[in-house]
Design a protein with these regions (language model features):
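Beta-strand-rich, repetitive solenoid scaffolds
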Residues: 4-9, 14-20, 26-32, 36-40, ...
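Extracellular and organelle-lumenal recognition/adhesion modules and their flexible linkers in secreted
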Residues: 38-314
Length: 314
């Protein structure tokens, strides 16, 4: 029996053996070459959550006004926007090709800037420190030809500050030259060893005084090559989003009688103890106790159903 032995560059071997049989056979191998990005073959490839924009708990596809010079406004889950000069409209819209959804900003007179960004918590980005990563995104813009990307890390763990008073350190920045044709753009980023406290990725444009800016499939991954977009199943993507924000519809919680305490468990453990709004069909809420796993409260009038919002955003 003959064999071929392939040695690894560290230890161990792979042996390909042919059985001891009479006669001979021929196996023709097709010519070709290619590469495999082993960094991202398994696991949590895209560190940007909801890059597919499928989860939109706040607006469910409806348009949203982003108020100029205001605090950041969350849009589709995990993504926030802010603008300067004048208000703009943001909305999840139909995608292009196999991409189900894109996110679109519509410009307005006097707009001087629009920003679209995500903050990645320490637990999901710590291992990127000292590594090379690739940022990729699809974009088009019917008015402007330049989109700036910027990467930051938080100065203290999971604390990024506000739009007016950021507490971050810039890692790198660059510019994509875009057009009205929906195309992919990529950038390589060297993450410093100090970036162990959370990462922020920001896309920005200038005076979008008209027209539209369309964004799709943003991805941040280990390695120096942009690979295919990481499509996660919807249940997992929703759960990842609910770690930061939950919109529970009316009837999720029921208060059967007056002033009786009722408890509710969150669908996932939240990032930190959330701020909450509980809205009953009648009466008022009191005695609320909240943890990362759920809450309990009483309602002055029952029976009544209630809805709630819980936010643990960065």
């Amino acid at each position: 029996m003959s064999s071929v032995v392939i040695s690894g560059n560290t230890s161990g071997t792979v042996t390909i053996a042919a059985p001891a049989v009479a006669g001979s056979g021929t196996q023709t191998l097709q010519a070709g070459s290619g590469t495999v990005a082993l960094d991202n073959t398994f696991g949590f490839k895209n560190r940007l959550i909801n890059g597919c924009f499928r989860v939109d708990q706040r607006n469910n596809g409806a348009s949203q006004t982003i108020t100029a010079a205001a605090a950041l406004a969350y849009t589709v889950d995990r993504w926030y926007a802010y603008c300067t000069g004048a208000n703009v409209t943001g909305q999840r819209v139909a995608g292009t090709g196999s991409n189900q959804y894109n996110y679109q900003f519509t410009g307005a007179a006097s707009v001087t800037g629009i920003n679209f960004a995500q903050r990645i918590e320490t637990l999901n980005s710590y291992d990127l420190n000292g590594q090379n990563v690739t940022l990729s995104v699809y974009m088009s813009n019917s008015l402007l030809t330049s989109v700036t990307w910027t990467a930051y890390y938080a100065n203290t763990s999971d604390t990024f500050g506000s739009v007016a008073s950021p507490t971050v350190t810039q890692i790198a920045t660059g510019t994509f030259t875009v057009s009205s044709t929906y195309s992919q753009y990529t950038a390589n980023i060297a993450i410093p060893a100090a970036a162990t406290t959370g990462i922020q990725i920001v896309f920005s444009v200038g005076a979008q005084t008209s027209g539209t800016w369309v964004i799709g499939y943003p991805q941040l991954e280990l390695g120096t090559t942009a690979t295919s977009f990481d499509i996660r199943d919807h249940t997992r993507e929703l759960s990842m989003c609910q770690r930061y924000y939950i919109s529970a519809p009316n009837g999720t919680m029921v208060f059967p009688v007056n002033a009786q305490y009722q408890s509710a468990q969150f669908p996932v453990v939240m990032r930190t103890t959330p701020t909450m709004t509980i809205t009953p069909g009648s009466g008022s809420i009191s005695g609320t106790t909240i943890t990362t796993m759920g809450f309990y409260a009483a309602c002055s009038l029952g029976p009544t159903a209630a809805l709630y919002l819980a936010s643990a955003e960065l």
